[in-house]
Amino acid sequence: MQIFVKTLTGKTITLEVESSDTIDNVKAKIQDKEGIPPDQQRLIFAGKQLEDGRTLADYNIQKESTLHLVLRLRGGAKKRKKKTYTKPKKIKHKHKKVKLAVLQFYKVDDATGKVTRLRKECPNNDCGAGTFMANHFDRHYCGKCGLTYVYNQKA
């Protein structure tokens, strides 16, 4: 039977084949006529790429069917260069986890069992209850709202 192969340039070539011929045989016949090596050929029929081991009958290719020949593209994307950085990477801060850290804000009197606060609590309504102020050598400072109480300094 006779089939047609449409090449990349739009030229149509005719091949004399049997329905029992494999795709490999068809590619070899195309190589004889066009000089394109079989490993670079891709044959398309009815929108499907034809695999080398199968026969023309497997794909229901009948007489005067047209196959489309396209070339196989080799390779992939362009290799990218590795970036070089001028500054070393910044080391992230590690959170220091202190077990039972709340105990440093309170003191329990041994004799009476009374609990007293060691730190001053921020009076600002925005901060809410339980927000303690930091003790500095000359002031109390709230880290949440920025409220600062400075100690009286004697001249």
Curated annotation (Swiss-Prot):
Residue(s) of cross-link: Glycyl lysine isopeptide (Lys-Gly) (interchain with G-Cter in ubiquitin): 48, 63
Origin superkingdom: Eukaryota
InterPro entries: Ribosomal_eS31, Ribosomal_eS31_euk-type_sf, Ribosomal_zn-bd, Ubiquitin-like_dom, Ubiquitin-like_domsf, Ubiquitin_CS, Ubiquitin_dom, Ubiquitin_ubiquitin-like
MF terms (GO), sorted A to Z: mRNA binding; protein tag activity; structural constituent of ribosome; ubiquitin protein ligase binding; zinc ion binding
Entry's Gene Ontology BP terms: modification-dependent protein catabolic process; protein ubiquitination; translation
Gene3D superfamilies xrefs: 6.20.50.150, Phosphatidylinositol 3-kinase Catalytic Subunit, Chain A, domain 1
The keyword Nucleotide-binding belongs to this UniProt entry's keyword annotation: no
Cross-link (Glycyl lysine isopeptide (Gly-Lys) (interchain with K-? in acceptor proteins)): 76
Recorded GO CC terms: cytoplasm; nucleus; plastid; ribonucleoprotein complex; ribosome
ZnF segments: C4-type: 122-145
Residue stretches making up the Ubiquitin-like domain: 1-76
Keyword entries, A-Z: Cytoplasm, Isopeptide bond, Metal-binding, Nucleus, Ribonucleoprotein, Ribosomal protein, Ubl conjugation, Zinc, Zinc-finger
Family: In the N-terminal section; belongs to the ubiquitin family.
Additional comment: Ubiquitin is generally synthesized as a polyubiquitin precursor with tandem head to tail repeats. Often, there are one to three additional amino acids after the last repeat, removed in the mature protein. Alternatively, ubiquitin extension protein is synthesized as a single copy of ubiquitin fused to a ribosomal protein (either eL40 or eS31) or to an ubiquitin-related protein (either RUB1 or RUB2). Following translation, extension protein is cleaved from ubiquitin.
Name of the protein this chain belongs to: Ubiquitin-ribosomal protein eS31y fusion protein
Species the sequence originates in: Oryza sativa subsp. japonica
Lineage: Eukaryota, Viridiplantae, Streptophyta, Embryophyta, Tracheophyta
